[in-house]
């Protein structure tokens, strides 16, 4: 999970992709195909927009509380700015409240609830994280909401044996994941969920998930309140309840100790379930031990309250082996998914030989191929089945029964492992997939689109579209298309590092659905690809590099992307008007 490397510097990124040179792509043509031209709104000479001294890592959001579209930008130094959607000019801005003498890091994408922006950020003293905080901005009033005092997160959980405890430790906790909102009965504001891993893999660290009761948070500030104060932090999940993390290597993930960080940028995923909701929590590398309730490198399904029961068969799992878990055991788990190869799959074989004679789970840990780097997507099938599609940093994609997570229907390796003996992987810790799939339906068949990347010059990468089909009543993956096509030399030049997250839209009711993504380079490129056939229908070079793992915002036929100027490291939002041209 060596995630910090590209958050605050683009230098490593351009080492990886700077050798690829310029790439020319032609807009694909077919009968009655829409083509799209992207006209820059800002920054331009007329609308220079605004730039920021630090990166924009969180995804931009849309605010309509002022009766006009404003683009909310959360800068990593704690500035929250509202930009005019047409000109890029600052309508208003505010700073995250921070103790005097300390600095701010704001990485997680905030969440909007009823014209209130909830932000999660961390405060540093001389470079050391001292606290993690939540604050609320009243978007209508353009100010901090005084009814929500700044909330400093803290927690302490017992180990499984009940003898020791684990405290939430700010210096080794880091908030990468987007804040998530969920409803609560008889509550206007519901719950907010804040997830943590670490900025790298330095121990001791764990995965933490905080459940924040928004009504209780506000009630605790009411001077007229007569009844006892409620608990704002209503519940906390700890993924690896170990009080000791005895590692001998620089990074604990390789030894499968502690860890289990919740760090995927899209955050835990929340879906309706009966009369409530369920939360799917993907975790990163670390320790997995069912008896000790350690759940690194898994997907956990939880309900409100965050009380977790894996619901695995106790007899089948009595002698659980973290390196070679019994297939019958892990298939028995209702609320826990543990990744594994299919019986006929070829073992992972990095060219370095680092995984020779290693089990699959051991290889994932050694190579830093977290399952939890990506977020799952839930899809309802025509036959009534619901499935999860979960990518992994190792280049594979899992197809899982969403009601019984232990059931793995399929696994498909959609991109090769980075590097060869003569073409060393530039940044092997990145893996080959960090994303969240987007999905749609074509002719009643579910389609998922998954971005891949490879930091070498040998293996093709790009967006991969898969159909989910039924074979003998069982869901399976079926390859649909890949952009660029693997036979195209561009497939060896594009997508050499983390791209943006993908997003889907259609420009009119009669138009085809398009998936949009930003490939990062000295000057990044927006690509629009038609989902029904994988045809390239739009391409636009950015003024800046773009921003890895940020989701483009599309509103009213405008697309807004976070970007950074490599020469100055100034961050900005770039905006383009999507215009349709019929052939």
Residue locations for each model-derived region?
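Bacterial N-terminal signal peptides
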Residues: 9-20
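Extracytoplasmic/lumenal domain signature
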Residues: 23-56, 62-73, 78-104, 111-117, ...
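Bacterial N-terminal signal peptides that target proteins for export
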Residues: 1-9
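Intrinsic disorder/low-complexity signature
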Residues: 3, 21-23
């Amino acid at each position: 999970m060596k995630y910090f490397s590209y958050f605050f510097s683009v230098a490593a990124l351009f080492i990886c992709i700077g050798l690829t040179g310029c790439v020319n792509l032609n807009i694909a043509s077919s009968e009655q195909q829409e083509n799209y031209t992207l006209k820059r709104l800002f920054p331009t000479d007329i609308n220079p927009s605004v730039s920021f001294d630090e990166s924009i890592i969180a995804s931009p959001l849309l605010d309509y509380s002022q009766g006009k579209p404003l683009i909310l930008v959360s800068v990593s130094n704690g500035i929250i700015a509202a930009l005019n959607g047409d000109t890029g000019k600052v309508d208003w801005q505010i700073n995250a409240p921070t103790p005097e003498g300390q600095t701010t890091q704001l990485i997680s994408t905030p969440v909007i609830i009823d014209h209130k922006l909830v932000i999660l950020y961390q405060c540093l003293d001389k470079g050391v994280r001292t606290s993690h905080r939540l604050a609320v901005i009243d978007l209508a009033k353009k100010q901090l909401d005084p009814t929500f005092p700044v909330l400093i997160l803290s927690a302490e959980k017992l180990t499984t044996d009940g003898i020791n405890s684990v405290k939430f430790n700010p210096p080794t906790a880091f908030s990468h994941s987007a804040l998530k909102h969920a409803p609560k009965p008889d509550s206007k504001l519901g719950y907010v969920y804040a997830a943590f891993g670490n900025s790298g893999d330095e121990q001791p660290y764990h995965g933490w998930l905080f459940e924040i009761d928004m009504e209780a948070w506000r009630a605790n500030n009411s001077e007229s309140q007569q009844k006892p104060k409620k608990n704002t932090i209503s519940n906390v999940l700890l993924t690896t309840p170990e009080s000791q993390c005895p590692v001998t290597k620089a990074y604990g993930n390789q030894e499968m100790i502690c860890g289990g960080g919740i760090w995927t940028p899209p955050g835990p995923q929340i879906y309706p379930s009966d009369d409530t909701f369920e939360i799917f929590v993907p975790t990163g590398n670390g320790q997995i031990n069912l008896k000790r309730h350690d759940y690194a490198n898994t997907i956990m399904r939880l309900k409100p309250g965050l009380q977790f029961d894996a619901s695995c068969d106790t007899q089948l799992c009595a002698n659980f082996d973290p390196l070679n878990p019994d297939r019958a055991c892990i298939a028995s788990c209702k609320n826990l998914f543990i990744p594994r190869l299919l019986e006929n799959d070829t073992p992972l074989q990095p060219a370095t030989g680092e995984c020779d004679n290693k089990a699959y789970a051991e290889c994932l840990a050694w190579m830093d191929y977290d399952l939890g780097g990506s977020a799952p997507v839930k899809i309802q099938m025509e036959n009534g089945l619901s499935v999860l599609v979960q990518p992994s940093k190792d280049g594979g994609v899992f197809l899982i029964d969403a009601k019984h997570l232990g059931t793995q229907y399929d696994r498909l390796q959609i991109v090769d492992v980075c590097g060869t003996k003569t073409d060393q992987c530039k940044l092997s810790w990145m893996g080959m997939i960090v994303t969240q799939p987007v999905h749609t339906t074509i002719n009643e068949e579910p389609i998922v689109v998954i971005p891949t990347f490879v930091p070498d010059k040998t293996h093709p990468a790009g967006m991969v579209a898969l159909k989910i089909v039924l074979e003998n009543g069982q869901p399976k993956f079926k390859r649909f298309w890949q952009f660029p096509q693997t036979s195209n030399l561009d497939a060896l030049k594009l997508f050499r590092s983390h791209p943006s997250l993908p997003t889907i839209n259609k420009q009119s009711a009669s138009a085809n659905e398009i998936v949009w993504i930003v490939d990062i380079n000295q000057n990044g490129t927006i690509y629009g690809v038609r989902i029904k056939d994988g045809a390239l229908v739009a391409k636009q070079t950015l003024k800046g590099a773009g921003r890895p793992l940020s989701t483009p915002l599309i509103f009213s036929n405008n697309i807004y992307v976070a970007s950074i100027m490599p020469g100055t490291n100034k961050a900005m939002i770039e905006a383009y008007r999507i215009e349709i041209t019929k052939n």
